[in-house]
Amino acid sequence: PSAGHGALSAPLSDFTVMIEQASIFTAGPPLVKASLGEDITKEELGGPEIALHSGVIHNLARNDESALEQIRTWLSYLPSSAWQVPTRLADAEGKRKVNEILDIIPENPRQAYDMHDVINAVADSGSVFTIQPMFGQSLITCFARLSGRPVAIVANQPQHMAGSITVEAADKATQFIQVADSFHLPLIFLTDNPGVLAGSSSEKAGILRHAGRMFLAQHHATVPKIQVTLRKAYGFGSTAMGMNPFDGQTLNLAFPGVSFGAMPAKGADDATGADQETRKALREAELSSGYRSASSLSIDDIIDPSDTRNMLLQGLEIASSR
C-alpha cells in the first residue's frame, strides 16, 4: 500500500503502473475508520478498481516483472532526455495501403466501431502501447510507431459514449499531450466525435473547464500535429482535437463524407424549430461540409481512407524537413 505523501507521487508522475495486489490512498483504513467512522478495506479504498478508474494510476500489471516491462516499453518511445529527440527505429515498415479501414468503419455514421482497430491498422505492426485504458474511455491515448518513428496518438473511441469528450477523457488527454510535447513526440489526432459531452451532469462536473484545458494543451504543443477526421467532428469537440487551422498543425485531413459544424443538423433544426424545407437543407449542407471546408483551406485534403498511413508518414516527413 501507498498512503499520504508517498501516494502523492503517483498523480504527479508522467506514467504510473500498479500491480493487482497494490493499493493507494490519501489515508489508510485505520485512519479513515478513526476520523470518518467508515469501515473499509484497503482494496475498497484504493485498490486497482478504484485507482485505475479514477485516473490516479495509468496502467495495471499482473506482478512486479510485468510492471517493469511496461515501464521499459513506455520509455522505449522517448528520448534519453527532454533535450533530445526520440530515436527512429531502423529497418521499419514503410508506406503501405490500409484497405482494412474500409471494413472497420461502418457506412452508417451512427454505428459504433472500435478505434483500436483503426490505430492498429495504421501503426507499425505490434507498436501500439495504450496508456490509461480504464480511465476516460471515450478517448484513446497511446504511443505507437509510424515507419519506426515514435508518435503519440489521441483518438476518439466511438464504442464508448460515441467518442464524446468527457471530463475524464479531457483530463487524460491533457496530461498525455503535455508529456508527448515535453519529449518531442509528434501528435496524431484521429477524430470522430459528436462534440464535448453535454448535459447537466457534465456541466456540474466542469466539462467546459476540463475541455478548455485539453484545448490549451494541444494548442500550446510545439511538436508536429496531424489531425484526421474519420466521420464527424462537432462544436468544441473538433477544436479540442486539433482540427482548426489557426492551431498551427502540420497537416489537417479528412475522409470523404465527413460532417462538420457547430452541432449536428438534427440538433440544429430541433433547436431552431426549423420547417421541413430548412431541415432538408441542413441535412444536405451537413453531408457536403467536408468538401466545403476543404475548399476554404481549413482541411488540407480529403483522402482515401486506405491512404491514411501513407498520408501520416508524408506529414511526418514534411515536419522533419522544417
Show the residue positions of the predicted features.
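Ligand-binding clefts of soluble mixed alpha/beta catalytic domains
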Residues: 1-322
